[in-house]
Design a protein with these regions (language model features):
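N-terminal short leaders/motifs
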Residues: 1, 33-35, 74-78
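Short, conserved loop/helix-junction motifs that constitute active-site signature segments
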Residues: 5-8, 36-37, 55
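Conserved donor-nucleotide/metal-binding helix-loop-beta segment in metal-dependent transferases, i.e.
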Residues: 1-30
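A glycosyltransferase accessory/donor-loop signature
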Residues: 41, 50-201
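Short, P/G- and charge-enriched loop/turn segments at secondary-structure junctions
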Residues: 28-34, 109-114
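A recurrent flexible, glycine/aromatic-enriched loop bordering the glycosyltransferase active site
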Residues: 32-43
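Serine-hydrolase catalytic core recognition
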Residues: 47
Length: 201
């Protein structure tokens, strides 16, 4: 309810920064200023009157059509390219992404406090990592919340899928080499200490 009562100051859409939202490569690719930000399209709080008035759906589709083959993140790139100057940034807890759990994600330090609060007290959880809660190998700290609702559906008794063995083995090997001190993981892939307790099985 709080989300729907947000005053967006006549912006077309309320958004949350992407988990790599301050990565300069986004702005080099899309051709606008880093100061405008790069948002995640998993949650969009739309002012439909503004969208209709400015014909934004058509503009997004036109952008997609004219940039075929150049959209690394598909609809998300197109939405950012069209709407970067017509957004209202919401607290990050409304789209809490997996990389918010990391020590050093591609997010400016000025946003870290908001990011930490979103990780520890999320309102909407966005399972953005490759291994999802419906994969047996999932070790997301909040996977149990997903299961709570999954069990209430008609699919709740289905067996979980197995993630790609090749992809999962790569993850395990990287973690093993990191623990042995042979090859350190890049900082953006290292979880903050308070979340390691979820990984001790």
């Amino acid at each position: 309810r709080d989300l729907y009562n947000v005053n967006m100051d006549n912006a077309a859409v309320g958004v949350v920064i992407d988990q790599s939202g301050d990565d300069i490569r986004h702005f080099n690719r899309l051709g606008y200023s880093r100061e405008k930000g790069y948002f995640n399209s998993g949650l969009l709080l739309m002012d439909l009157e503004v969208w209709r008035e400015k014909e934004l759906p058509n503009k997004v589709l036109e952008y997609i059509d004219s940039h075929k083959g150049n959209l690394q993140f598909h609809d998300q790139d197109a939405l950012n390219a069209v709407l970067y100057d017509d957004t209202y940034y919401l607290p990050m807890k409304y789209n809490s992404q997996f990389s918010f759990l990391y020590k050093n994600p591609y997010i400016d330090k000025s946003r870290w406090q908001d990011m930490y609060e979103a990780a520890e007290h999320p309102v909407i959880i966005h399972y953005t990592n490759k291994i999802k809660p419906w994969h047996r190998e999932c070790i997301h700290p909040y996977k149990d919340i997903w299961f709570e609702y999954y069990k209430k559906t008609e699919w709740g008794k289905n067996k979980l899928r197995e993630y790609s063995k090749k992809g999962y083995m790569k993850i395990l090997i990287k973690e093993f080499l990191n623990k042995c001190g042979i090859r350190k993981l890049n900082p953006p892939t290292m979880l903050r200490e308070e979340f390691y307790k979820f990984y001790q099985h």
